[in-house]
Design a protein with these regions (language model features):
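Conserved beta-strand-loop-beta-strand hairpin that lines the nucleotide-binding pocket
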Residues: 2-111, 128-136
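N-terminal assembly/transducer modules of large multi-domain enzymes
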Residues: 99-184
Length: 184
């Protein structure tokens, strides 16, 4: 996976495969540390080490590389990856990456990743937050609320898709999440 956007899509896909209907994403940057927390209401994880590439619930192949690659990407910068079951059910995944580290991957187009997820899995509610420096969380997109306002056919229009993308991208750039790391 070439960038963090690829890793995010993989995590979101894991949530969907675990029958999640609601996925909450919190992103932020604090002291050159990018952090991401994803919570879902899916089926949870077994006690196995899901960061072992030879542990997978997949039936088609006996290898799962997504989480091991994310763990390596995080730890190679001095960051971390934690995955655990939520008390409410589902999974909580948190990772941190030192974006000032020479081995840090670029962000990639995270806004496009979210739009692709929203359109790929229309029955899943995605609630996206950014965490400000003062630790306040700001909701920047909620697919469930949008679907209450906009019809399915309207959602398919390019103008609506572009509006959703621009809205998410604008908010991510406010906390310096752009397709490249840039200079802080």
């Amino acid at each position: 996976m070439k960038d963090l956007a690829d890793h995010l899509f993989d995590i979101l896909e894991n949530s969907v495969k675990a029958a999640a209907t609601e996925v909450k994403i919190i992103l932020g940057i604090k002291d050159k540390l990018f952090f991401c927390k994803i919570e879902d209401d899916g089926s949870g994880i077994k006690d196995e080490d899901v960061t072992d590439p030879f542990v997978t619930s997949r039936k088609t192949r006996k290898v799962g590389l997504g989480l091991p690659l994310l763990k390596r990407a995080a730890e190679s910068t001095g960051g971390s990856l934690q995955i655990y079951n939520s008390e409410k059910g589902g999974v909580i995944l948190e990772f941190k990456i030192d974006i000032a580290h020479i081995d840090a991957k670029p962000f990639g187009d995270i806004a496009r990743t979210f739009v692709d997820a929203i359109y790929s899995w229309p029955k899943v509610s995605f609630d996206i937050f950014i965490q400000k420096k003062n630790n306040k969380k700001l909701s920047i997109f909620n697919s469930k609320k949008i679907r209450e306002i906009v019809s399915y056919s309207e959602m398919q229009q390019k103008e609506v898709r572009d509006f959703i993308y621009d809205s998410i991208d604008r908010e991510l750039k406010k906390i310096k999440i752009d397709s490249q790391f840039g200079i802080f």
